[in-house]
Amino acid sequence: MSDEEHHFESKADAGASKTYPQQAGTIRKSGYIVIKGRPCKVVEVSTSKTGKHGHAKCHFVAIDIFNGKKLEDIVPSSHNCDVPHVNRTDYQLIDISEDGFVSLLTENGNTKDDLRLPTDDALLNQVKGGFEEGKDLVLSVMSAMGEEQICAVKDIGTKS
């Protein structure tokens, strides 16, 4: 046995799983599901009756929460599906760099500089326009399965 102390750096996810299992029959519209390895928001669920050979099936129609693509999957209702852990966090916008990255202020006073400007034109114009006018903006960042993206912007007044 050694008397050495072990120091561990804390990581954001601490090895936590990016998804959790949930029975297909219990997933509802506006819930989340992983289809083809992508985190999606369910927009339509239909179930078929139990057939002669097997289970009732759930037909999911969902939209990828990051790229907006429509995906579909059919799963026996008694089987488990992966459901992504989806988090939404608000950060105050500090700066926009020339290369398209934003500088955000976290709750504990650190800066977060690893996010690009949104690709959605309306959201992009709202962020850039508000920043150029000197408004105090709060950006909502959605994160799931190791990906992050700016999904909304709020104006909290003009800078004093």
Swiss-Prot record:
Organism superkingdom: Eukaryota
PTM statement from Swiss-Prot or TrEMBL: Lys-52 undergoes hypusination, a unique post-translational modification that consists in the addition of a butylamino group from spermidine to lysine side chain, leading to the formation of the unusual amino acid hypusine. eIF-5As are the only known proteins to undergo this modification, which is essential for their function.
UniProt-listed InterPro entries: IF5A-like, IF5A-like_N, NA-bd_OB-fold, Rib_uL2_dom2, Trans_elong_IF5A_hypusine_site, Transl_elong_IF5A_C, Translation_prot_SH3-like_sf
GO biological process: positive regulation of translational elongation; positive regulation of translational termination; translational elongation
Gene3D superfamilies for this protein: 2.30.30.30, Nucleic acid-binding proteins
Positions bearing Hypusine: K52
Region of interest (Disordered), ranges: 1-21
CDD domains: S1_eIF5A (cd04468)
Keyword Protein biosynthesis: yes
Keyword terms: Hypusine, Initiation factor, Protein biosynthesis
A molecular function GO annotation: RNA binding
SUPFAM superfamilies referenced in this protein's UniProt entry, alphabetically: Nucleic acid-binding proteins, Translation proteins SH3-like domain
Start-end of Basic and acidic residues biased regions: 1-12
SMART domains reported in the protein's UniProt record: eIF-5a
Role, per record: Translation factor that promotes translation elongation and termination, particularly upon ribosome stalling at specific amino acid sequence contexts. Binds between the exit (E) and peptidyl (P) site of the ribosome and promotes rescue of stalled ribosome: specifically required for efficient translation of polyproline-containing peptides as well as other motifs that stall the ribosome. Acts as a ribosome quality control (RQC) cofactor by joining the RQC complex to facilitate peptidyl transfer during CAT tailing step.
Family designation: Belongs to the eIF-5A family.
Protein's recorded name: Eukaryotic translation initiation factor 5A-1/2
Native species: Solanum tuberosum
